[in-house]
Amino acid sequence: SQTEPDKGDPMLVRTLAACAALFFVCAPFAHAQTAQHPLDPLGWQEYWTVLEVLADAGHLDEGTEFSRVQLREPDKSGVWNWTPGSSITRSAFAVVRQGPQTYEAVIDISDSRLTSWTELTGAQPMWLEREFGSGASQVKEHPEFIAAMERRGITDLTFIDCIAIPPGYFGTVEQQGRRIGYVYCSDARGVRNTWTRSIGGLTVVVDMEDGTVLRVVDEGVIPVPETLAEYDRASLGQPREVQGPIHVSQPLGPGFTLDGHQVRWQNWSFHVRPDSRLGMVISTVRYRDGDRDRPVLYESSLSEIFVPYMDPSFAWHSRNFIDAGEFAAGGLTKPLLAGRDCPDHAVYFDHVVAGDDGRPGDRPNMICVFERVAGDVSWRHIGDPKASRPKRDLVVRMAAVLGNYDYLFDWVFNQNGSIRIGVGATGIAEVKTVIEADATTRPVGETRADAHGRFVAPHIVAVNHDHYFNFRIDLDVDGPRNDFLIDRLESVTLPEDNPRRSVWVVDETIARSESQAKMTIDYNRPAVWRVASESTTNQVGYRTSYQLMPGSNGN
């Protein structure tokens, strides 16, 4: 569903007037609303249908938990051929936990029946929301943990907060056949931001199925720093004044139209849906060319975020986070702040998310859509005549919050027919506490405290790490029959009588397998991927195609 900007927004009256005039839907959808498109997310009542069907089949009790409940997408060809007003068959897919057992279920929502119920073996589902906080009571009562805290001068555990996280899997005997959590603790006394108050060098290994403490690993006492890292307004004081406010307004309302989860802007049309694990999914992207809506892309979304930390200590070597696959409990995305995360004139999509018990809950402002004019130039040439075209984009944005990191993801639709995916990482760097105060206080003969990171505050080191963002992109350029090409720049030596000596040419190769399509970004061997239609050519005889152009790496 979509929601209007916050009622304190000075643009509200004008926006609502424009919405009424242009028949935009600006109010939240009712819980009972039925799907208007085959790829619409599950609605409130559909989640309840899932629960009722599982209960009727004898697969639901007080201990049943859900790692995932989502739309089970219909057949791709059926989606492309669907027309508004046609009937829609709805199904759901669920990952269900019952004690140590995990099951995959397919539920026919339209007919209220269970289609399949399959036990998974040798696999671990996503973590549940409750698991991150579970095990703390057993840990704080364990004698080895109490002794380790006493060695640090801490005898009152009242304000010690502990959290369990999934460690990287290394196939150790301890990990095999178990759902393991590593528990880390911090001193929350008198602070909001506890990232700088961690109990350094102390890790507790817990069996998440029954809460059993398997071992307590103490790598040495590190005093809890007194360094504060609060970021609330009261702690930071008066912010830097910014002269000359900039206002962007759309007195006639947005330049795009919404019909449920379908968006139309200039020549673009597409479907957007929130998704609890992936954040959002962009589907059925078409571009209007004259009197034809030409297919460009069937579906695209984030598929995974991999964040490995580069510290060999026990407390850190296992921090190889699979963010979307392990940490998306309760929904990968979190609400966007109107007027700050998105401009005042943005329109929002709400979402319904299943909790650990499978029951639906409302999540407002999960996706925003807005037009962006940043003063950039789309195209220009100064000749006769002088010509320039201002740039105007349509942005579809979500924000993921995973522990200390906040990620912003933009799908940007451009007027020139291109689509750009932008990723931004912000939030708080994950840090460890160290004995040394800074880079100048290294003990003689010992390993530097910042050997695997950088000091960011006294006794605080931000640990080196990577962020790998993986996206699933299913292009259907002028239809589903496409070739995956690699265009490589090859140097060609010219005859000796040519003063140029050499030029480069483009060598086009069709990749027939994933191994053939693999490519390392190497500026000494330039190449790009391209997806080309098998059946459609452009006005000069080339096959219509889209390039996949990776951005910068290693920043």
Task: Identify the role of each PLM range.
Residues 9-17:
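Bacterial N-terminal signal peptides that target proteins for export
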Residues 38-80, 128-171:
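Short, non-transmembrane alpha-helical segments in secretory-pathway proteins
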Residues 112, 118-127, 152, 189-280, ...:
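Extended effector regions of multi-domain proteins
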